[in-house]
Amino acid sequence: MTTTHKILFAFDSFKGCLSSAEVGKVAAEGAEQEKVEVLNVSDGGDGMLSAFCQAYRAEQVSCNCHDALMRPIRAAYGLVGDMAIIETAQACGLSLLESNERDAVGGTSYGVGELLIDALDRGARRFIIGLGGTATTDGGFGMLKALYVHAGPAAFFDTYLPRLRNECSWTLASDVRNPLYGPQGAAAVFAPQKGATPAEVVHLDARLQRLAQHAARRMGHDCSMLPGAGAAGGLGYAFLQYFGAQMQSGADLLLDALDFDTRLRDAALVITGEGSADKQTLMGKLPWHVLQRAQKAHVPCCLLAGEVSNREELLKAGFREALCIHPAGLSKEEQLRTEVTKNNLSLTTSQLLTRFFNAEIKE
């Protein structure tokens, strides 16, 4: 009689190709003889809204707002009771722009402010904010401008901001720990990915520093060097500085909401992964958080990714296996094709499980 094992799948998205839910579903097809459980997960970046809404059983609603180039769009967020789930990239995401439209200097987070206004009008007072995937490096200035326009200049600093700070709770879901400015700041580390030239990086970093200095003088405190202030182009800073937000690991926040540790108890194996796995994976990305919890529960954990670098470091960290799903020599263009990724992911999962349960993958 064949023994059936419980396999827990908890994948981050494969950026530009498959969402978290899609990756998990396809991988599970390679485990057809096993009992599988697929979790839709995110660390606060891409796919955050879908994953968190599912975990918190929130309804997705939408409103009119503006993208990073101030073009009118409809953007979604989650709402359950008095809690709103906001994915900043829904309003000012890099994925909303064509590559030739990226404007690292002019991109604005104004639309995020519009999402907040709509959620507040619907009664939201508790907020989970997913930071990541934005096209902006404005330190949250655009978001604050939208709130300023809504509240009016007379009320903004005197009554509106204090109410947001004192009557609402703000939880930032992110695993980014960079400060607002400096060598490890939002501009230096993330702006090049958003199309910034070296000269623009210098300009943006100086602009963020001026923004923080002005706020510190006016408010008497400075959050610019706090871990996570540089997340989402400095939106993290704006929430920390102006709203008194609390930064939490996006991955841990979601895994707790999914009761992940309980789900682990009867699992024979956990399989996690992301589009590209390397030593950065071990610096707080979602697969690392999955690994930590699996190790604590004494459940083996394997990693699958579209690309794998620093494999020995990944194995040394505790992954039982770390595999690239694509064969050697496959072009980057082919790797990003959805059907190619689906086929290779399902096949690699099947091969991994065969090896694992035949005891070919040792501790």
Annotate the PLM regions.
Residues T2-L131, A135-E363:
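N-terminal loops that bind phosphate or other acidic moieties
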